[in-house]
Swiss-Prot record:
Species in which this protein is naturally found: Dictyostelium discoideum
Gene this chain is encoded by: mvpB
Keyword Heme: no
Pfam families named among the record's database cross-references: MVP_shoulder, Vault, Vault_2, Vault_3, Vault_4
Name used for this protein in its record: Major vault protein beta
Source domain of life: Eukaryota
Length: 846
C-alpha cells in the first residue's frame, strides 16, 4: 500500500475513481467512490495521493483478485463488528465483465484483465481440480469434482476459468486418415465414449477416419498403417493373446494365420495381433511342381505334421503358417532319348502303369528312361539324372555293381548305367597322378597338362617310341610289358610300375620318377672320386653310352632293377676305382682312357672287350668317355699346374728360338733380293733416259714445221664455220617469216568465222521478225474480218468506189484489192514467195 501523503482537505473524485480514507479514531479504512467532492476531516487521512481509477473489465475478459471481499446472497458486503469489509484472506476470485468497481482495502489485482480463452472445434482444454467443488452446468445439472480429478472442456466454446480449476494443457484432435488407425492406451480405468470399460494399460484401436479428440484418460501410442493386400502378397499374423478378430473369429494366444486379398483389400492389425512377415504368392506353371511339408488340414485348419503334399501347376497359392517347401519350386523332369532318372522309394507304395501295378518297397532302385516328362510322387526320391555316356574306341569308364561290388571297365560304345551300377573312381598314388599329367617325352621344356583328371574314366597312357611300360595286375598276380608307341588302358585291378632312377651329377637316388623305361641308345654322365697307387685323389667325369637288349620271351627282365642308372654307376665306379688304385698318377695321367676302358670292359684272350653286359636287366654299355680328370688334393693340383706351366714355358722358349732363327734367315734373303732389285731398276732407268733424248729431238723438228700448217688449217676452218653460220641464219629467217604468215592466216580465218556467225544471227533475227510480222498482219486482218462480219463486208462491197476507199482506209488498210467471189487470190503464197526471195538475196550477199 502506498505511503499516505497529507494534501488538501478537499479532494475531487472523478466518476469511476475512488480513494481509501483511514479513520484514525477507529483505525478503519473505508472507500469513497466518485463522482464527489470529498472533504477530509481532521481525524481522517487519505491513503492515496490521487484518486485511483476503478477496475474496468471489458466484455469477454476477466481478472483475478487476491484476498477478495465477502458478499452475502443478496450481493451486499459483509462487514465485521468494526464496520470493516470482511476478506477471504489467501483466497482468489475471478471476476468477469461488469460495472467498474473499486478495490477494497486488502484486495490485490494479481493479473490485469485478459481475454477469455476461446476453444475451437476439434480442440479442448485439459483441466485439473485443485480443490473440491460442485459445478453447475448450463442444463442445471450439478457435477461434483474432487481434488485431483481431470476432465476436458471441449470446443467450440468460451472457457470461463475458476480458481478451483487448473488448466493443464490444450489438447488438439488427431486426424485419422483412410487406411489408418489410432492406437490408444488407458492411463487409468474408465468408460470410453463407446461405453466400453477400459482397464489401466489396456490398448485398443480407433479405426474411424476423421478427427478424434483423445480423452483425458487416453494416451496416444501411435498410428497403425493398413496392410495393402494384393493377389501376390499376403501377411502372416500371430495372436499375442486370445481375442475375437475383426472378422468375428476367435483367435487363441499363439495362433498363427494369414490374411489375403480374399478376406479384404486392406487390413489394419489389431493390438492383439502381431505381423510376422509378408508372404509372397507362389506361382506354378504347367511345367513346374512343388512339395509342401506339414500341409494344413482344410477340415481342422491345423498342420498335418510329418505329411507332405504334391502340388502341380498351373496354380497360385500362399504357404500357410507351418508349411514349407521341400527343395523349393522344381521343374518337371524332361528326359531326352539319351537320358534317364534313377529313382529310389522312400516308403512302400503301389505304382500303376496302365493295367499293371508295381509294388515298390523302401530302398528299391529303378530307372525311368526318356523321352518323357516325369514328376516324382511324394514317396519317390530322385537320386540322380543320368545321361548316356558316349565312348570312343580308346575311351572307357569304370563301373561298379553296388550289389556285388564287382568293378569292370566299359569300352568302345555309348553306355547307360543300370540302376544297380555306379561310376567307380579308381584311386591312384599321388606320384602316378603327377606323372600322368606330365608328357611321356623327356623334353623338359614341354608343358604339362594341368587339368584335373576324371577318376571314373579309364586311365590311358601313351607309351612313347622306343620305350616300355610295365603294368601289374594285383588280382591275377602277373605283369605285362607294353612297348611303344602304344596306348595303354588300365583295367580296374591294374597299376603302373613307377621307376625311381638316380639322376644329376654326381648321381642322386630317386631323383627321376617315370612310368616309361626308355630303351636307348642313350648316354649318362657321372662324377666319381678315385685314388692312385701314390695316393693322388682324382675326380673323374665319365660318360657312358648304353642301351637295353630286349628279350622277347622275357620282357619283364627290363624292370628287374628299379634303378638301373644307380646300379650302372655303382658297378662301373667300383671297377674304375680298382683299376686306378693299381696305377700311379703319372701312368694314369698318360693312359687314363685305356686304363678305364680296360677296367670296365675287361679283356678276353688278351684283347679288350667292346661292351659291358648286365645279365639282370639286359643293360649294355658300349662306350666310356673320360670328359675330365681333376685332382682333388690341392697340393697335387698345385704341382700339376706347376709342371704344366713349366712344360708350357719350355715349349714357348723353344718356339721363340726357332722363330728368331727363321726371322733372321728371312731378313737376309730379303736384303739380297732388295739389292738385286735396285740394280735392275737402275738399268731400266738408263734405258728410259736414252728414249727421252730421242723423243725430244723429234719434237723439235715437228715444232718447226707444224706452225705453218696449223695456221692454214685454222683459217680454212674459220671460213667454213662462217659460211655454215650464214646458211643457218638464212634458214631461221625463212622459218620466222613462214610462222608469221601462218599466224596471220589463222587470225583472218578466225575473224571471218566470227563475222559470218554474226551475220547469220542477224539474218535469222530478221527472218523471225518478218515471219512474226506476217503472222501479226494475218491475225489482224482475220480479226478485222471477224469484227466486221459478213454483212458489213457485203455492204462495203456494194458501196460506191469512193465510199469503199474511205471505209477501208478507216479500217487502217494501206493497200487493198477488191475482187468478186468467182476469182479469189492466194495472198498467203505470195507472202511466202516474198519471204523466200528475201532469204535468197541475203544468201547471195553473203
Amino acid at each position: 500500500m502506498a505511503t499516505p501523503v497529507q494534501a488538501s482537505t478537499v479532494i475531487r473524485v472523478k466518476p469511476h475513481h475512488y480513494i481509501h480514507v483511514l479513520d484514525n479514531n477507529t483505525n478503519v479504512t473505508r472507500v469513497e467512490v466518485g463522482p464527489q467532492t470529498f472533504t477530509r476531516q481532521d481525524h481522517e487521512r487519505v491513503l492515496n495521493p490521487t484518486p485511483l481509477p476503478m477496475i474496468l473489465i471489458p466484455p469477454r475478459q476477466y481478472c483475478i483478485i487476491e484476498n477478495p471481499i465477502i458478499r452475502d446472497k443478496e450481493g451486499k458486503l459483509v462487514v465485521d463488528k468494526f464496520n470493516q469489509p470482511k476478506l477471504r484472506h489467501g483466497d482468489q476470485e475471478i471476476r468477469f465483465s461488469q460495472d467498474p468497481f473499486p478495490l477494497y482495502p486488502g484486495e490485490v489485482v494479481i493479473a490485469q484483465p485478459v481475454p477469455l480463452q476461446v476453444i475451437q472445434t476439434n480442440s479442448a482444454l485439459r483441466l485439473k481440480c485443485l480443490r473440491d467443488f460442485v459445478e453447475v452446468k448450463a442444463d442445471k445439472t450439478t457435477v461434483s469434482h474432487i481434488a485431483g480429478d481431470e476432465w476436458l472442456f471441449e470446443g467450440p466454446g468460451t472457457y470461463y476459468p475458476r480458481v478451483e480449476v487448473q488448466v493443464v494443457e490444450p489438447v488438439r484432435a488427431v486426424i485419422i486418415k483412410e487406411n489408418q488407425a489410432l492406437k490408444l492406451r488407458a492411463r487409468l480405468s474408465f468408460v470410453d465414449r463407446r461405453d466400453v470399460v477400459r482397464q489401466v494399460g489396456e490398448e485398443w484401436l480407433v479405426r474411424e477416419s476423421g478427427a478424434y479428440l483423445p480423452g483425458v484418460s487416453e494416451e496416444i501410442v501411435g498410428f497403425i498403417q493398413a496392410l495393402v493386400l494384393t493377389d501376390r502378397i499376403a501377411y502372416q499374423l500371430l495372436a499375442t493373446r486370445s481375442f475375437t478378430d475383426s472378422f468375428g473369429k476367435v483367435r487363441k494366444a499363439g495362433e498363427e494365420w494369414i490374411i489375403t486379398q480374399k478376406d479384404c483389400d486392406t487390413y489394419i492389425p489389431d493390438v492383439n495381433e502381431k505381423v510376422i512377415r509378408d508372404i509372397k504368392a507362389i506361382t506354378l506353371t504347367n511345367r513346374q511342381y512343388c512339395i509342401v511339408e506339414n500341409p494344413i488340414d482344410p477340415k481342422t485348419g491345423k498342420n498335418k505334421l510329418g505329411h507332405k503334399e504334391l502340388l502341380q501347376g498351373d496354380r497360385t497359392f500362399f504357404l500357410m503358417p507351418g508349411e514349407s517347401l521341400v527343395k523349393g519350386i522344381q521343374n518337371v523332369n524332361v528326359l531326352s532319348e539319351d537320358e534317364a532318372l534313377l529313382l529310389s522309394a522312400k516308403e512302400e507304395f503301389v505304382e500303376k502303369k496302365g493295367t499293371t501295378t508295381i509294388v515298390h518297397k523302401p530302398g528299391d532302385l529303378w530307372m525311368i528312361y526318356g523321352p518323357c516328362d516325369y514328376i516324382p510322387p511324394i514317396q519317390v526320391d530322385v537320386v540322380e539324372r543320368r545321361k548316356r555316356i558316349p565312348l570312343d574306341v580308346n575311351e572307357g569308364i569304370y563301373v561298379r555293381d553296388i550289389k556285388t561290388g564287382k568293378v569292370r571297365s566299359v569300352h568302345g560304345s555309348s553306355y547307360m548305367l543300370l540302376p544297380n551300377e555306379e561310376r567307380w573312381a579308381k584311386p591312384l598314388a599321388p606320384i602316378v597322378e603327377e606323372l600322368l599329367k606330365k608328357s611321356a617325352s623327356r623334353d623338359q621344356n614341354e608343358e604339362h597338362n594341368e587339368s584335373d583328371r576324371d577318376s571314373t574314366k579309364v586311365i590311358t597312357y601313351r607309351v612313347p617310341h622306343n620305350a616300355a611300360v610295365q603294368i601289374f595286375d594285383y588280382r591275377k598276380k602277373e605283369a605285362r610289358v607294353v612297348f611303344g608307341p602304344e596306348l595303354v588302358m588300365l583295367e580296374p585291378d591294374e597299376e603302373f610300375t613307377v621307376l625311381s632312377l638316380s639322376g644329376k651329377i654326381p648321381k642322386r637316388p630317386n631323383h627321376i620318377r617315370s612310368l616309361a623305361l626308355f630303351l636307348g641308345p642313350d648316354f649318362m654322365t657321372d662324377l666319381i672320386t678315385v685314388e692312385t697307387a701314390d695316393h693322388a685323389r682324382l675326380s673323374l667325369k665319365l660318360s657312358y653310352n648304353w642301351h637295353f637288349k630286349v628279350e622277347q620271351d622275357n620282357p619283364s627282365k627290363l624292370f628287374a632293377t628299379s634303378d638301373f642308372t644307380g646300379d650302372l654307376c655303382k658297378a662301373t665306379g667300383s671297377l674304375v676305382r680298382a683299376a686306378v688304385a693299381a696305377s700311379t698318377f703319372d701312368n694314369f695321367h698318360k693312359h687314363s682312357s685305356d686304363i678305364i676302358q680296360q677296367a670296365v670292359f675287361g679283356s678276353t684272350d688278351g684283347s679288350s672287350n667292346d661292351c659291358l653286359y648286365f645279365e639282370t636287366n639286359g643293360l649294355v654299355i658300349t662306350n666310356i668317355d673320360v670328359q675330365s680328370v681333376e685332382p682333388v688334393d690341392q697340393r697335387t693340383l698345385d704341382s700339376l699346374q706347376k709342371s704344366v706351366q713349366l712344360a708350357i714355358e719350355i715349349t714357348t722358349k723353344s718356339q721363340e728360338a726357332t722363330a728368331r732363327q727363321e726371322a733372321e734367315r728371312l731378313e737376309q734373303m730379303a736384303r739380297g733380293e732388295l739389292e738385286r732389285q735396285k740394280i735392275i731398276d737402275e738399268a731400266k732407268n738408263e734405258e728410259s733416259r736414252s728414249k727421252l733424248v730421242q723423243l725430244q729431238a723429234q719434237s723439235a723438228a715437228v715444232e718447226s714445221t707444224g706452225q705453218a700448217v696449223a695456221e692454214a688449217r685454222a683459217r680454212a676452218e674459220a671460213a667454213i664455220i662462217e659460211a655454215e653460220s650464214e646458211i643457218k641464219q638464212a634458214r631461221l629467217s625463212t622459218r620466222a617469216i613462214e610462222i608469221e604468215a601462218l599466224s596471220e592466216i589463222e587470225n583472218l580465218k578466225a575473224k571471218h568465222i566470227v563475222e559470218i556467225q554474226h551475220i547469220k544471227s542477224l539474218n535469222n533475227l530478221e527472218l523471225i521478225k518478218a515471219k512474226e510480222s506476217a503472222t501479226i498482219e494475218t491475225t489482224k486482218f482475220e480479226n478485222y474480218v471477224e469484227a466486221l462480219g459478213s454483212d458489213t463486208i457485203k455492204s462495203i462491197a456494194q458501196a460506191p468506189e469512193e465510199t469503199k476507199a474511205k471505209l477501208l482506209a478507216g479500217l487502217g488498210l494501206k493497200s487493198f484489192m477488191i475482187t468478186d467471189g468467182k476469182s479469189p487470190l492466194n495472198l498467203f503464197d505470195t507472202a511466202n514467195g516474198l519471204i523466200a526471195d528475201a532469204q535468197r538475196s541475203e544468201v547471195d550477199e553473203e
